[in-house]
Amino acid sequence: MKMFDNIKNVGKLIRLERIFDKKSEKTVIIPMDHGVSSGPLDGIKDMRITTNAVADGGANAVLGHKGLVRHGHRGYGRDIGLIIHMSAGTSISPDPNKKVIVTTVEDAIRLGADAVSLHVNVGAESDFEMYRDLGLISETCEQWGMPLIAMMYPRGPKIKDEKDPEVVAHAARLGAELGADIIKTNYTGDPDTFKEVVKGCPAPIVIAGGPKTNTDEEFLQMVKDAMHAGGKGVASGRNVFQHKDVKGITSAICKIVHEDAEVKEALKEIKI
């Protein structure tokens, strides 16, 4: 894949091919790490059911904490990539923006991971600790040939707008500078400003799905706009696993991301 030409580590390249479509060179990731931060939300109470639905819908990978492997591994159905999330923090913590590392790259390898991810809140009072974690873990990932996804979110006392193009661009560039292979960050809400974010980041960017949207059309249009602006995929949780038709919405996303389908065409994948 051309966008990974700068990566010379063969192990990383092999694993990246498991979570990116070789033809479109893009990815659809379904994060299911919300149980740690927010508790047993609807849609991920039974992770096997959700994993099966998104796999059947064509998703390239699921993302979650190491418990996802134990409680979400199916042993049947369509294969799907596995990304182990290394960061944790809760909504009921005194500092919800603080994320700590709760597992290792070596543990992720033992669990069969195709990539690892960690979360950095850029602008949080504890952000310097998360920067240190990202920089050090990127070195370990390089040693083991493990792709690293950095979730770079502008959040903190000085952040007035988490979709501000300047702060999103800064967050994305920061993640790439500290060694991430893939950046997950907010879509700015506008294709023109997001193009500038992409231009300023040497690593491919996957957009976050964001809060649950009012309509499927609104959500899919965001995905469409982001892909045309240079995004290399989408990582969406609640807009997928809390949908009435999990398989259908996953398939609709895949139609747009991998086939450049129009929103109206993609909506036909949703049956409920």
UniProtKB/Swiss-Prot annotation:
Gene3D superfamilies: Aldolase class I. Its EC number is 2.2.1.10. The active site is at residues 33, 153, 184. Keywords: Amino-acid biosynthesis, Aromatic amino acid biosynthesis, Schiff base, Transferase. It holds the Pfam family DeoC. It comes from the Archaea. 1-deoxy-D-threo-hexo-2,5-diulose 6-phosphate binds at residues 33-37, 153-155, 209-210, 237-238. Belongs to the DeoC/FbaB aldolase family. ADHS subfamily. Homodecamer. NCBIfam families: ADH_synth (TIGR01949), PRK07226.1 (NF005556). This is 2-amino-3,7-dideoxy-D-threo-hept-6-ulosonate synthase.
